[in-house]
């Protein structure tokens, strides 16, 4: 149902303060009357519509994760190029190079999974459950590791409250929770793989 904000009985309860890149709040429905014309889809088909919507939303969460990971990688690269330790740029140390290479490789793989899910949806696939679950799972888990590695590359600067990577570190964690936790994505993926037709 689409419920207009001025509907009698619809009440804003409170804002939720959380580590996420967007606002969240709690609302209450107290004896709200909503006309049938505001119904989305057919009666009795809401759950199926909700699941189909999750297919699309999970891919967008994966895309958001890729964006955060890309920014974290950019910050780590900039720091590795300009920060000097023991008389040379931080980026010349092999352990830092290994982190940067791994971050970039995993980000590219995550992007490809997100693109695959988006492409399938754009091509009109009825369901993209498997593609979007894989994209969300891999991209959010990868983004968490990439942001963590970026904090490590930046060292003390990475944990300053004013640091971009510190803000990303606090925000990226929520992506592994909403639109289905990582654990739920594992169940969705395995369940589909175990079906004979994979759908």
Tell where the protein language model's regions lie, with residue ranges.
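FAD-binding core of flavoproteins
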Residues: 1-74, 78, 88, 182-199
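Structured core elements
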Residues: 1-2, 11, 28, 60, ...
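Conserved catalytic-core motifs characterized by acidic clusters
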Residues: 13, 37-54, 79-93, 117, ...
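Extended, low-aromatic, Leu/Ala- and acidic/polar-enriched alpha-helical coiled-coil segments
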Residues: 63, 94-104, 133-136, 141
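C-terminal helix-coil-helix/basic helical segment that borders enzyme active sites and/or dimer interfaces
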Residues: 77, 81-88, 104-138, 151-159
């Amino acid at each position: 149902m689409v419920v207009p904000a001025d509907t009698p009985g619809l009440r804003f309860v409170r804002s939720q303060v959380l580590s996420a890149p967007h606002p969240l709040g709690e609302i209450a429905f107290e004896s709200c009357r909503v006309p049938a014309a505001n119904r989305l889809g057919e009666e009795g088909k809401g759950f199926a519509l909700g699941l189909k919507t999750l297919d699309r939303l999970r891919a967008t969460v994966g895309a958001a994760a890729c964006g955060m990971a890309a920014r974290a990688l950019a910050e780590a690269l900039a720091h590795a190029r300009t920060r000097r330790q023991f008389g040379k740029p931080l980026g010349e140390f092999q352990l830092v190079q290994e982190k940067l290479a791994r971050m970039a490789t995993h980000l590219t793989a995550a992007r490809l999974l997100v693109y695959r899910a988006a492409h399938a949806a754009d091509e009109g696939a009825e369901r993209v459950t498997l593609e979007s679950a894989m994209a969300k799972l891999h991209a959010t888990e990868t983004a968490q590791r990439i942001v963590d590695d970026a904090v490590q590359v930046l060292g003390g600067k990475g944990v300053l409250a004013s640091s971009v990577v510190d803000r990303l570190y606090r925000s990226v964690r929520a992506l592994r929770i909403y639109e289905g936790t990582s654990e739920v994505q594992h169940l969705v993926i395995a369940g589909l793989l175990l079906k004979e037709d994979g759908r």
